[in-house]
Structure formats: structure tokens, C-alpha cells
């Protein structure tokens, strides 16, 4: 959380608690614990990545003979949650069933480590795609945004706010987006922002963080709309709305500064689409779209005609069809005279 009154942040030292003793995270120990405790169910193969609150490993499901991703909460968060509360919260998250949300297969406690299991997506993330191509076409961007917006709308209806929408959490399987990692929603709903930030755990990602999330205010689904607007901007412009050297500076920009007009860096984006993204990035939640589906409808409503050349082509086809009808009518009229 950022204290805007200081216009900077304050670095928080990350200390990890094992029981009542502070210590340092040893990821090899975490992997070793998982490997030993889950040996009869999952064969841990390698580490895929680590964030501020969890580490994820590639594993093989021993029974299904399929690849899965095992996400293990770091000891700090595991200590705050506890196994009983974790089980209650993961039960809510596991009920999410949507074609564009990555499902949960399994969860539990293994030798003190809290974990959950997801399908392994053997593809790339939106981040990988943007790293390769820098920016996407208008059509491809809108296709991805539409599906993610529908997934978010469903999750919000189930009472869950994602809180960490970013390209890394949008996985692409055969080109279809899957929204991953509702774990941060689970953690925040169970523990609370204040307790998490006090331990040094980052809640969300500054480049895509809504102003209200940056200052630790109460959130609703419009915070996810803002983050999705940041992703939309990056897909089309080739960079996020803001650039900063530190997380604290980035959060100040999210709170205080308006993003550059999208069409300055991407003139071929239709004006109404740029306006829709601009509204999604409004500083005040009340000035944004009320829901992801409303944002999606605004994009769809302005996406039917991409350019004047396409409009001209459609008009020419209509004119040609009308002319053909007139000719047929004249031929028939002369024939029956």
C-alpha cells in the first residue's frame, strides 16, 4: 500500500515467519517439502516461477499421468492464513467454472506447506506474446479482452475480485485466453490488505494497479476494470499506460497522472475504442464502466467497423446488390409488358 501523503513509498523488509521465529525463505526447502510430502500424488519436476506470495512448480499427476502446476504459498502467507481458513477460502475459488478461467484441481496442506493444483497450460502467456510481438492487432486485442471480460464478469458475480489482472495472468491455450491466479483474491479476502502489506507481501502489480488499490482503499469489481484497461492499453500501444523506475513511483502515477492518449502511439486504433479504454482508466471508480461486461460492450459497439476502407467495401457491396435488384425488376417489367 502507498502512503500518498509522502508521495513516495517506504521499503518494507520481507521477513518470513516459521511458527514464531523470523527467518529467510529457502525455496529449496519449500520444494523439498513439497517433493517429499506429495510424492504419492504429484512428482515435482522443476520450478516455473515465483511471485511475492507464492512459488509455482511443474509436476506430473501420478494418477492421471498429466502435467499440472502446483502453487505453494510462501511461509509468511501460509502462517497468516492457516490450513483451516485456507481450506475454506480455496473451496470458494474452486467453484469457479468458466471456459476462460483456469480451474483448480486440488488443494491441501503438505508438511506445513499450503498448496493448490491447476492444469499446466503448455502454451504462452499474454506477456510472452507481447514480448515477442510488442503489440497486437486491434482485432486480436478485442478478442482477448472480450473473453477475459466475460470471465471477470462471472467471477464478480460469484463475489470474487481478482486484484492482479496482468498479461502474466492471462494464459493462452491454442490461442484462447485463460484467466489464472485467483489466489490473491483468496488471500486478501481471508487475511486483509493491511495484514498482508505489514508482512511485506505485495498485493497486486503496480503497473496494472488501480488508484484505489494503490492507496489501500476498499475495492470492488471496478478495480479489475481499471487493470483490464491497463492490459488493453499495453496490447495496443506496446507498453503499459505509465512508466516508472520504482514500484512506489508507479503507484503515484496510477493515482495522480492520466495516461497518454492511446492514438498518439497507435493512430490506427479507432477513436471510440481509445475513448473506451480511457474511460476504463479513469481515476475515480465512479467514472469508469460499472462492470467488465459494460467495458466489453463499449469495445464491441465500436469494433464492428474497423476503418473507412472496410466501410467503403461494405457500402459498395450494398450498392451493387441494390443495383442488381433494380436491373432484375426492370427486365421483369419489360418482359411482362
Enumerate the predicted regions with their spans.
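Short helix/strand-capping hinge loops at secondary-structure junctions
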Residues: 284-285
Amino acid at each position: 500500500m502507498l502512503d500518498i501523503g509522502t508521495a513516495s513509498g517506504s521499503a518494507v523488509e520481507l521477513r518470513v515467519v516459521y511458527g514464531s521465529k523470523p527467518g529467510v525463505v529457502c525455496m529449496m526447502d519449500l520444494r523439498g517439502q513439497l517433493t517429499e510430502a506429495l510424492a504419492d500424488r504429484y512428482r515435482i519436476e522443476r520450478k516455473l516461477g515465483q511471485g511475492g506470495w507464492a512459488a509455482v512448480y511443474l509436476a506430473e499427476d501420478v494418477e492421471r499421468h498429466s502435467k499440472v502446476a502446483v502453487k505453494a504459498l510462501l511461509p509468511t502467507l501460509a502462517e497468516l492464513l492457516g490450513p483451516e481458513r485456507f481450506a475454506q477460502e480455496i473451496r470458494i475459488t474452486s467453484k469457479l467454472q468458466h471456459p476462460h478461467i483456469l480451474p483448480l484441481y486440488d488443494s491441501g496442506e503438505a508438511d506445513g506447506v499450503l498448496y493448490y493444483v491447476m492444469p499446466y497450460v503448455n502454451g504462452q502467456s499474454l506477456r510472452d506474446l507481447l514480448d515477442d510481438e510488442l503489440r497486437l492487432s486491434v482485432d486480436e486485442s478485442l478478442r482477448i479482452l472480450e473473453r477475459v471480460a466475460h470471465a471477470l464478469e462471472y467471477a464478480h458475480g460469484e463475489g470474487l475480485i481478482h486484484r492482479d489482472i496482468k498479461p502474466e495472468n492471462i494464459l493462452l491455450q491454442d490461442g484462447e485466453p485463460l484467466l489464472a491466479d485467483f489466489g490473491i483474491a483468496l488471500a486478501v479476502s481471508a487475511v486483509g490488505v493491511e495484514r498482508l502489506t505489514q508482512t511485506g507481501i505485495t498485493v497486486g502489480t503496480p503497473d496494472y494497479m488501480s488508484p484505489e488499490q494503490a492507496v489501500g482503499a476498499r475495492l470492488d469489481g471496478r478495480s479489475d476494470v481499471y487493470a483490464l484497461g491497463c492490459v488493453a492499453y499495453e496490447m495496443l500501444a506496446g507498453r503499459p499506460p505509465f512508466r516508472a523506475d520504482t514500484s512506489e513511483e508507479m503507484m503515484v502515477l496510477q493515482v495522480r497522472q492520466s495516461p497518454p492518449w492511446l492514438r498518439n502511439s497507435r493512430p490506427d486504433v479507432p477513436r471510440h475504442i481509445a475513448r473506451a479504454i480511457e474511460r476504463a482508466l479513469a481515476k475515480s471508480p465512479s467514472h469508469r464502466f460499472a462492470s467488465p461486461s459494460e467495458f466489453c460492450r463499449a469495445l464491441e459497439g465500436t469494433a464492428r467497423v474497423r476503418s473507412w476502407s472496410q466501410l467503403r467495401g461494405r457500402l459498395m457491396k450494398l450498392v451493387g446488390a441494390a443495383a442488381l435488384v433494380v436491373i432484375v425488376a426492370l427486365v421483369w417489367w419489360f418482359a411482362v409488358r
